[in-house]
Regions:
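Class I S-adenosyl-L-methionine-dependent methyltransferase catalytic core
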Residues: 1-153
Length: 153
C-alpha cells in the first residue's frame, strides 16, 4: 500500500507487539505507537480518549470494534488526512457498516490478490495458508466520492 499511498506523522493506536509499527518505521514512516494494553511496545493509551490527531492514522484494529475505530479515527484526524485500516474483506458486509460507508466512504480499498497469513503475536507456526481475505481500507477525511478498488500483492 505504501507504494501508492503516502502517510505523514502516523498514529498506530492498536499497536499490540509493534509488528505493523516496526514495518512502517523500516519503510521510513514516522510512527507514534500506543495500545490500550501494555504489550511491550509503544505507549499505553485509550484511543477513544484522543480528541485530535494532526497526522494520519494506520492500524489493524480489534475486529469486534473495527467500526468504532473507523468512526473515531475520522473524528480525530484533520480534514484531508488519511485513515488506513487493515481489515478482513468481509468488513464491507453488514447493514450497520453500510450506513457507515454511506456517511464515510473509503477513498480506496486495496484488496490483497493473494491470501496473506496473519497470526496473533506473529507466530506463523502451523499456518501454511489463510482462509481469510484481507484489504487495506483507506479513508481521506472529507472525501465524498465513490470508493475505488485496487488490487495489491
Amino acid at each position: 500500500m505504501l507504494n501508492v499511498e503516502s502517510f505523514k506523522n502516523v498514529l498506530e493506536p492498536a499497536c499490540g507487539e509493534g509488528h505493523l509499527s516496526k514495518r512502517l518505521i523500516e519503510l521510513g514512516v514516522e510512527v507514534h505507537s500506543s495500545d490500550l494494553i501494555d504489550r511491550g511496545y509503544g505507549g499505553v493509551a485509550d484511543f477513544f480518549g484522543i480528541e485530535k490527531w494532526e497526522g494520519d492514522l494506520i492500524t489493524n484494529p480489534p475486529y469486534n470494534i473495527a467500526q468504532k475505530f473507523v468512526e473515531h479515527s475520522l473524528k480525530v484526524v484533520l480534514e484531508g488526512n488519511k485513515v488506513a485500516m487493515f481489515l478482513k474483506l468481509t468488513f464491507l458486509e453488514g447493514q450497520a457498516r453500510r450506513k457507515m460507508f454511506e456517511k464515510y466512504p473509503p477513498k480506496t480499498v486495496y484488496v490483497f490478490s493473494k491470501r496473506i497469513k496473519c497470526a496473533k503475536g506473529g507466530d506463523f507456526n502451523g499456518f501454511s495458508s489463510s482462509a481469510v481475505a484481507y484489504a487495506w481500507f483507506v479513508w481521506e477525511k472529507g472525501f465524498k466520492g465513490k470508493p475505488k478498488i485496487e488490487w495489491i500483492d
